[in-house]
Amino acid sequence: MYFSCSAENESWKNILGHIGAEHAWDEYMLERKLIISEKTEAGIYCRIVETAPENKTEANDTITSGNIVWHAIGCRLNQNIPLSFTSPEVTCFLAPQGESVYLYSLQVLPELRNRHLGTAFLSALLPRLAKKGFKSIKLQVSSKNLPAMALYKKTGFYITQTLSFYEY
């Protein structure tokens, strides 16, 4: 059984320790300001495809609960751009929330990981979101997902909240 509590909540952490629950992992909420004039890495194609709520996929039903969902896709410029719509090398989902946008399910094809494609994709995506009027972007990531943590730190995200999970 798992319990969760805010990392700052010392009284809950003491109670969980008293019953023998052990810290298992943390989930972080990360955020980053969006800047229109930000430098974009060359060599990447990025497109945001707006999706109507009735076209939601199973992957994004739980996140948006009826709101608009966007799908962002990317590929290296040396690839066939029209093919990127059916076989993108990088994908993510975006859920607009007022002046912020929530990013989730960022994926790079396994055979292309550790080649800076995620960094290049975010460098192209983030200014596009700023041009759409968004002020910040938010996401959630597990402390166990070290490659994702490194990517987000490298691209300017910072931790705004920590939720700790304890196993009992």
Regions found by a protein language model. Name each.
Residues S6, L109, R113, S142:
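Residue-level recognition of the GNAT/N-acetyltransferase active site
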